A protein has these predicted regions:
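Extracellular beta-strand-rich solenoid/capping regions of secreted or surface-exposed proteins
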Residues: 26-39, 49-75, 80-94, 105-114, ...
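Extracellular parallel beta-helix/beta-solenoid repeat domains
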Residues: 128, 159, 164-172, 176-179, ...
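Beta-rich extracellular carbohydrate-active architectures
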Residues: 47, 79-83, 100-103, 119, ...
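Long amphipathic alpha-helical scaffold regions
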Residues: 112-117, 123-133, 139, 183-184
Length: 200
């Protein structure tokens, strides 16, 4: 367990790391790899993700990149970034619990291309006309993508459904609670949105 979030910059192997902030902090962009587990407890503080950003070679534009096979939980605080591209690029099993995620300059605050994603009692703030999150069946990822929104979550921004050409893996958007202040944008790549969206 660390109180310094810069520990996230040095993850290796099958790291199993807990971060618990003891004050507001700033950290460079970070990434997680397959087999790694990260629990980020902001403890009612603000973590600002700054430059340099991270990503795949040639596209290092994310404030964090969470790769397939990793497990990440963020809870109890505010995650912020001035990123003007994609703030959180997610391919992993991700839980956002009692969070505020602020990416007012980002095109996408949270882009989900793979994995199981739970947004619980969490506020996501996007800028005007931008995307709070998406559900994207991306490329050749074979695990599909499932996003569940529940509790008192507030989604300020658009939500997009899309998929890559040839991707036939399962996609789900399960809305079990929350307030949505934005448009649902269904890309032309989605031919049957009613098979993806479940409102209960």
């Amino acid at each position: 367990t660390f109180s310094d979030p810069s520990a996230l910059l040095y993850l290796s192997g099958n790291a199993n790391v807990k971060i618990r902030l003891n004050g507001d902090a700033t950290c460079n962009g970070f990434k997680t790899q397959s087999g790694q587990s990260v629990e980020l407890d902001l403890n009612n503080h603000v973590l600002t993700l700054a430059k340099p950003t991270v990503g795949s070679a040639g596209t290092e534009t994310n404030s964090c990149q969470l790769l397939k096979g990793s497990t990440v939980t963020m809870k109890n605080g505010t995650l912020a970034s001035d990123n003007d591209k994609i703030m959180i690029q997610n391919y992993c099993n991700l839980t956002l619990d009692a969070m505020t995620v602020k990416g007012l300059n980002a095109l996408y605050v949270l882009s989900n291309n793979c994995g199981n994603i739970l947004i619980s009692n969490t506020k996501i703030n996007a800028g005007i006309g931008a995307y709070a999150f998406d559900v994207c069946g991306y490329s050749t990822y074979t695990d599909g993508v499932k996003v569940t929104v529940k509790g008192t979550s507030i989604i300020n921004g658009n939500v997009e459904l899309s998929k890559s050409t040839g991707n036939t893996e399962p996609m789900e958007l399960n809305i079990e609670g929350g307030t949505f202040n934005g448009n649902l944008v269904v890309d032309s790549s989605i031919t049957n949105a009613s098979s993806i969206i479940n409102v209960t």
